[in-house]
């Protein structure tokens, strides 16, 4: 059987959120991130909300809310997201309360996401980080369904900060089988090679969150 052809470098770049969420990041680091993102031709840059506003002509600016633990009060997440959008963020990646999901408290997860959705209305894309590596398959499916009901635009695997790990092909495939075609699927956390990125895209990821974008893109054909 013939191997599936790899997507081109440009095709992959168009799906990348070039990300800098390190707590020690400086304004100069963000400026360097933006410059590299423009050189690479990626879709977006993703930075911490405290680094906004970011001047990034030609790029989408994304940020996070309730990051990385998800243990913030829903109203705090909503306020953080709303302020970020006021400061120019076009996309917000919020973290759910993973403990609530692990406990099967899906009504609490729903309320959390709805609060953020209502806070930003339709002014920005809302991605919901579920920390898939910390959840059972059943919980992944249920949280994806909850995110869809709450009005999210994407579900996202991971913050990249959770000790359970980051994106996996299994989780992405499960997420895509549950809400793919209706919601975007963002894989993030521990994606450092072109091979890993290609596997996640083949499994159904429609967006990639990467901090090592240049190294990953170097593995794709022009």
Swiss-Prot record:
It catalyses: 2-deoxy-D-ribose 5-phosphate = D-glyceraldehyde 3-phosphate + acetaldehyde. It is an enzyme of class 4 (lyase). One of its GO terms (molecular function) is deoxyribose-phosphate aldolase activity. InterPro entries: Aldolase_TIM, DeoC, DeoC/FbaB/LacD_aldolase, DeoC_typeI. Pathway: Carbohydrate degradation; 2-deoxy-D-ribose 1-phosphate degradation; D-glyceraldehyde 3-phosphate and acetaldehyde from 2-deoxy-alpha-D-ribose 1-phosphate: step 2/2. Its EC number is 4.1.2.4. GO terms for biological process: 2-deoxyribose 1-phosphate catabolic process; carbohydrate catabolic process; deoxyribonucleotide catabolic process. It is found in: Cytoplasm. GO terms for cellular component: cytoplasm. The active site is at residues 93, 156, 186. Keywords: Cytoplasm, Lyase, Schiff base. NCBIfam families: deoC. Belongs to the DeoC/FbaB aldolase family. DeoC type 1 subfamily. HAMAP family: DeoC_type1. Catalyzes a reversible aldol reaction between acetaldehyde and D-glyceraldehyde 3-phosphate to generate 2-deoxy-D-ribose 5-phosphate. This is Deoxyribose-phosphate aldolase.
């Amino acid at each position: 059987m013939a191997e599936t052809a790899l997507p081109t470098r440009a095709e992959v770049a168009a799906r990348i959120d070039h990300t800098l969420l390190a707590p020690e990041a400086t304004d100069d680091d963000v400026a360097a991130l933006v410059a590299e993102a423009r050189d690479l031709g990626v879709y977006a840059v993703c930075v911490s909300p405290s680094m906004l506003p970011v001047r990034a002509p030609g790029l989408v600016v994304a940020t996070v809310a309730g990051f990385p633990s998800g243990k913030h009060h829903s109203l705090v997440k909503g306020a953080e997201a709303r302020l970020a959008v006021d400061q120019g963020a076009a996309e917000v990646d919020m973290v759910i309360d993973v403990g609530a999901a692990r406990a099967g408290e899906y009504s609490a997860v729903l309320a959390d996401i709805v609060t953020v959705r209502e806070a930003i209305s339709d002014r920005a894309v809302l991605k919901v980080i579920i920390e898939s590596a910390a959840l059972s398959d059943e919980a992944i499916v249920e949280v994806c369904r909850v995110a869809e009901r709450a009005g999210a635009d994407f579900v996202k695997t991971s913050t990249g900060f959770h000790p359970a790990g980051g994106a996996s092909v299994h989780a992405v495939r499960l997420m895509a089988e549950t809400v793919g075609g209706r919601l975007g699927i963002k894989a993030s956390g521990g994606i450092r090679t072109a091979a890993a990125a290609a596997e996640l895209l083949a499994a159904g990821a429609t967006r990639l969150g990467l901090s090592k974008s240049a190294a990953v893109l170097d593995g794709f054909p022009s």
